Each structure stands twice: as C-alpha cells, then as structure tokens.
Amino acid sequence: MAGVATRAAWPAPTTAAPVLTFTLPAGAKRAVVSGGPPPQLLKLADVRPGMVGEALTVFRGTKPEPFKVRVVAVLKQFLPKEDVILIRAEDPRVEHSGIVAGMSGSPVYVDGKLMGAIAYAWSFAKDPLGGVTPIESMLAERARPRRLDPMELAASAGDTGARGLPALVGARPVGGALGGEGRLVQAAVPLSVSGFTARTVAELTEALGPVGLVPMQAGGGRRLTPGKLEAGHVEPGSAIGVELVRGDMSMVGTGTVTYIDGATVLAFGHPMFGIGESYLPLVDAEIHAFLPSLAQSFKMSSPLHEIGVLVQDRQTCIIGNLDGRTTMMPVDVRVTGPEGKTRAFHAEVARNRRLTPMLASMVVANAVADAEPDVTDMVASVDGKLALHGHAPLELKDQIFSTEGISGRLLGGTHGLRALAELMFNPFEPVVVDRVDVDVRIELK
C-alpha cells in the first residue's frame, strides 16, 4: 500500500523545545571532578625514544589505574600535519590484552607531565604497541569556536548529498574496527548496547563497523528515571561515553578521559564519527571487564550518569562541556501481535541529522523483533507519527510484507522513517522533529 501523507490532529504543534543549554537544569548536579588542576604538558619536541612513563585507564569499576609504558618512536606526519607517538605497554595486564578498544583517550604521563592520549593500535598484534596523540594537537582543537545553531545541527537544511552512516565512513582518517592488519589504525570505540536482540545487533554491526564502532551486548543500560538526578564522576583516566540511545534500549560509545580544565573535557584522542561540531549527551561509565581477543580486545561497560554534552568531534579528540546538557528525541513504539497483545517500548535517540534516522529505525526494528521474533510470512501495518517543532504533525501509513520476519532494512524503508530523514535533510529550512510515535500491527500469513 502506498504511504499517504496526511495532516493529523495529533498532537498540537510544539513551539518551544530547547535542544542545548550550557546552564545546568534545575535540580541537576554537576559531575564531581577529581584529579586536581591541569597537569604540566610534555611538548612533542621533547619526546625521545626510551622515555618511560605511565598511562591511566579503568580496568574494572570506575577507578583509573596506572600502567607502565615506554616510548618507542615518533611517527612524523602520521595524519595530515599531525605526528603520533609510538609506545609499548609494559604491564602484564596489557601485554595479555594488547591496546584495548575503550582505552582511547587514556592519558600518558612522563615525569608527571602529560604527553598525550592513547588512540591507535594494531589488530592481530602480538606485542602491546599503540599510538599516542600528542596533547598539543588535542588542545589546539579546544580553541575552535562553536559556529552553528544547535537547533540547525539537530536538523540542518541545505545538504542533499550523501546521507546517514555511510557518509560518515569517509570522515574516518584511518581504517575501521578490525581491518588494517600491518598498519596502525584508530583504536575502535566499543559501542555497548543493551535491550537489543541478537538480530538487531548484527544489523548494527554491519551499519557501524565501517566507521570504527564495535557493537557489543552489555547489561545495565541507563534507564530514564525522572527525579533521580545523581551526580556523575569524572577524572583523567576515567571511562566516558557518548550516549546515542537510552531508555528501554541503550547504546553508548565508550572511551577514556584525557584532560580536564574547568568545565572542558578532552577524550578519545581521535574522533568518534569525525562530524565536527555536534551536540550529543556525555555519560560516565562503569567497566565490567577486559575481554581479550586476537582481533581486537575491548572493554565491556555500562553507562552511569549524564555528565555533560559533546560539543566537538574532531580528528585528534572529542571535546565535552560538563555544564552543558542536550535533549534527545523520544521514540515510542507499540507492537500488536497476531493474538492482539500489545507491547510498548520507549527510548530516546541522539539528535543529529546523520544519526537520528538510523537510530530511530533500529529502535523500531528492535521493538518489532523482540515483540514478534518469528521468521515467517507476515504483514506489518505501520502508522508513523512525527511531531514537528513549530509545525503541524505528520502522519504516514504503510504496509510491509515479508517472508522472513520484519527487519530493520524493511522498516527503514517505510514512509514514516524515510520522511524523518527527508525532513532532516530538506533543502528549504531546518526542521526539528520533537518526537516519533510508531504503531505496528503484525498479521501472520
């Protein structure tokens, strides 16, 4: 059945929906910062092979622990106009696991001076060699001014070119998550997901693997608990995450804090997506375990508290603000099975024109896969309702037939979810989608 756009009487147009604030909301608590004032810096020009120092990272829990490292060499022009410091870890824990996905951003100190952040590694490496982004390169990004209206970043107009996650692949400076044998590549960012089915995780891996994100199922996603505003904790070496989905489902990319100065936090030592100025929630995280692997060891983690907002996603680091908060887009899904029983799911997804359509599609697909997992002939009737900021809402209807259950790809092709992407990329004016409601009715054939 062809999808027909209709102006619905649901709900009233929204006239005020703040996307970003750099003043803590009433009742919110600022993250507790420890570790003292910013350390002295070791200039790249003073780095020499053979120097011995220590790095900080969380092996388990929330407390950073030191491990010994030794400088091997300085790799000139590793990236355009950027050098990388080659190090070797000399600690039994890291010699067993190698440089771990999730260790990105771990600060490295020599004689008490901050040299930089662990950011690069080899897949299938036999020795724990890694690359360090010099702190000078990271601090240079801190001076970059914010230029764009956050509302427009959430839904920018004028870009009708490549869209969504495939367009992000070109933004990565070096190889993906597991490729790159024989060359130094960005340490992957473990994407901790909970509340997702194995089928949806497989689709996430296919979509996000090329951009250096490794989806892995973990427990303890951060649920939405109104009125519970606990303070998080952050210090150099602690785990920090970029939250993409929260609620009944959770998706968080986890790395490590490198440097804190007032409300400014530098982390990762490389980009997450490489999309420049952007506004996504930051959380602190708990590390459950290191999972060693020949291909790519990684940290298993869960998010704890919202602590700030990502403001820059650049070549040498991500930059956050501890006083900032940003909103996410609610997605409510109701799935009614053949027997008439309805299951409801609530999640919130990050506001970013390249991310939001994919994340919303995954939330809807996961809800359907969880509520009706049968891989058989079925018809899904989909009613999608988009509440638009300052405009009348939009309602679209679809019917899908599949012989192998309802997948994320099929749902992503429905008119409602396609309209979400088209609205965010429309060339006429920025459109902010306040929320998405999807009703799915399943019939077996």
What feature does the model see in each segment?
Residues 1-8:
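Sec-dependent N-terminal signal peptides
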Residues 8-445:
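Terminal presequence/propeptide segments associated with secretion/organelle targeting
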